[in-house]
Amino acid sequence: MDAFINQKESRFYEVLMPFGALVAARLNTEHGAHYDIKKILDWTFEGCKASDGRTGWGVIAERWGEDDVHGLQGSITDGGGYAFLMNSFDMAWPLVPMVRYDGRYAQAVGKWMLNVTNAARLFYPYEIDDRHQWLPERKEITENVIAYEGLRKVDYTYKKASLEGMSPVALGDGPQWVSGQPETSMYSLYSSAQVGIFGAIVRKTNVEKILQLNCNATDFYSRDSFPTFLYYNPYDTIKSVCYTNSEKSKVDLFDVLSHEYLSREISVEGCFEIPAGSARLIVVLPSGSELKMKDGNYAVGTTVVTSIKN
C-alpha cells in the first residue's frame, strides 16, 4: 500500500485502482492507518494522465448524443471516448463496500452507482435502439443476456457507413484483434458474465431512481458485520423510502452518517426519509441492540457497526 499511495500520479487501468480505495479504507478503520482515500478516488475517476501509462483511462462524465453515459469506465480519450461493460460492473465490487469503512464517500458512491446502473443498459442489444449498435441483425442470438463489449462515442474503429453521425455506438473489439474473427464476437461473454456484481448489490425501492445498495454483498473478506445498505436520493425534495425486513425477528435501522436511529422495531416494513441530494448508510440491527463505543467505533457486543468518523 505504501508503494501504491506514494505514486506521483494515477496509474489506473482496468480494475485494480478502486480496490486500493477499499483496502485503504479498511486499513484506516481497523488498523489505524492514514491512507489518503480521496487521492485514490481522484486517480480513479479523473483517470490516468501519465504519458508512460494507460493515458486517458478513467470514468466518463458526459452525454453522448441523447444518452447519459456518466459513470461508465473506460478510455476518456480514445476516439472521443470508449466505455467497457466489464470495467463498469467491476468498479462497484470495491467501491460499494468501501463506504462501510469510510462513510464520507457514501453520497458520491451512491450517485455514481445510480449513474452507472442507468448507463450500463446501453450495452445490451435490446436496450439500445438498432440505429446505435453495430450488429442489430444478429441480436436475437444474445437473448438480451449477452451484451456488447463496449460503447463508443462514435464508431471510431470500423467506420461503418450506417453508423456515421451516430452517438453512442454499441460494439466490441473482437473482430479487429484476430483475423477471421466473426462479427458476433462483438457480443461479449467475459463482460456480460460479471453482471452478477450488480445483481448482488442493486435492488429497487418503492421510489423510482432511489436504489438499495447492499454494502456487504461484495465485501468478501469482512469480519462479522450487520447488513448495511446505501441509499442515495437524487431528487431536490425529501423522499420517503421503505425497508422490508426479511428477518424473523424485529430490527432497528441506524444511519451511520447522521448517527441516529431512523426506525425501530420493524417487523415487516419500516420507512425513513432521505433529504434532497443526500445519502443514508443504514445498518440493520437486531431490535433493542445496545450501541457502545469501542476503540473509536460503534459496536454491538464484539461486532463493529461503523467507525465514529463516519
List PLM regions with ranges:
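Well-ordered alpha-helical segments within folded domains of soluble proteins
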Residues: 13-27, 79-98, 191-196, 225-231
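Long, well-ordered core segments of solenoidal/helical folds
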Residues: 1-11, 35-72, 111-128
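Carbohydrate-binding/catalytic loop surfaces
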Residues: 17-35, 45, 58-83, 129-159
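Membrane-proximal bilayer-interacting regions
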Residues: 70, 74-134
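Solvent-exposed beta-hairpin/edge-strand motifs
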Residues: 246-261
